[in-house]
Amino acid sequence: MSFIDEAKVYLKAGNGGNGCSSFRREKFIEFGGPDGGNGGNGGNIVFATSNHINTLLYFRYKQHIKAENGNPGSGKKKSGSSGKDIIIKVPIGTQLYDEDGILIADLSSENQKVIVAQGGKGGTGNANYKTSTNRAPRYFTLGEAGEEKYITLKLKIISDIGIIGLPNAGKSSFLASCTDSKTKIADYPFTTLEPHLGVAFIDNRELVLADIPGLIAGAHLGYGIGDKFLKHIERCSTLLHIIDCTLDDIIDSYECIRKELLLYNKELINKPEFIVLNKSDLLEKKEITKKKQLLSQYTKKEIFVSSIKDNRYAILSTLIQYIHKKNANAEPYIYDPFNI
């Protein structure tokens, strides 16, 4: 499946049905009076989040979306039926913007819904305009037009852990070894061309990890492919920085990524960060210890060591305990789907 994280679509909510102008016609009733019914409301266009979708691929093939119009009213005070709402499922983490680039809605939680295009109100039938001074009104109103607009959808993947690092650091191998993620793995730059999600289950708890591809020097300016995916790091609560321990200068490798995060969005470097020296099976134990101490002294952080032979249980266990503790201390979030 292709990964699409941005799309532009045209929305047209349903028009309201027209009201009806009619009069009661029955035998032996000379002046039956007005009995025109109201028109039905037009259908709304609703966006809703789904756990079963992780891309905006649907909108590559469906760029014009129209809801059903309301039906007109009829005699005997019968109201027209309202048009059906269209409910469009999008991934959690989707943001909706209007043509001016103003945020309409941020769909960042499960089972979130928002009406993006409001259907038109149905017209009023002439039965509603009968008064003591006007017993036979012929007046009725037309249904209102439904909203129409162009919107832009932008997906920012939400995960517990964002895996960052230079190409070939072993991010995809790490993700694949500890989750059920099916990622392409090879020894050349930019093997991973799109974000991959994986779910690890440790100590009966769930941990969602995202492999963020393409981070190199100048990524924030568009070099490599990192500028397309730096935005996904914004939605990761914690960063897992993987460094290839076979590199001559691991400090430079570390600072290269940190600099790109800072230049893209200075808030990113304030995210909690765990550091892993990867591919430790390719070096002597003495050399690994030396590099671990060097990086620990420089970053003032605990350094984990990993290799393809490890099951990474200790690293994941530490991460999941940290995330669980962090979530336990978080403020409860109450969502109102109609308060944009």
From Swiss-Prot:
Residues 1-158 form the Obg domain. GO terms for biological process: ribosome biogenesis. Residues 159-325 form the OBG-type G domain. GTP binds at residues 165-172, 190-194, 211-214, 278-281, 306-308. This is GTPase Obg. Its cofactor is Mg(2+). GO terms for cellular component: cytoplasm. It comes from Ehrlichia chaffeensis (strain ATCC CRL-10679 / Arkansas). The gene is obg. Belongs to the TRAFAC class OBG-HflX-like GTPase superfamily. OBG GTPase family. Gene3D superfamilies: GTP1/OBG domain, P-loop containing nucleotide triphosphate hydrolases. One of its GO terms (molecular function) is GTPase activity. It comes from the Bacteria.
